[in-house]
């Protein structure tokens, strides 16, 4: 166990339901290694300020990061309504990559021959295979599998029960709906969204919204300004 004096001080960006799930992951990590001390949440919803989420206080807005210069950060503001905006939000509040940590749930299976970037959250029962490259600011939700030699682009969200086959390339700012399956050797462009249960059999250009089995093009996502 890590002595209290050596624990990493952590602030969670986002005090919504996703933030509470991230807090639960920290709790599970601490049961095994006592690694983190959570100081609080930062959230732009002023109605949450000075209140508690899961017993942890909401201590300010995202801009309040400047008031906590010596703590680690983890981002928990991702969602289907704003997945393409996360990059710009984070650029506005913190440009120092060294301040972000990565959380890997103890039940996840992550190959030692994979690479995981910063500000990533690997949820329970995720499997990440050999030679997988996971970028930065990425969430991989429970029971998802990323197979060998695949690449996951920055700021992407992979929701529950995803299956990414071998040698798949996923671009930046993508959102994969629950249960999405992608066959091997597929290339998916930036800022793409798949509906729940989609089965992707073909390459997808940038800004594609697809759904169904097999996945069919529906429309384009909102352009990233």
Predicted regions and their residues:
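Conserved acidic residues
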Residues: 39, 71-72, 172
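Generic C-terminal helix-cap and adjacent flexible tail
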Residues: 219-225
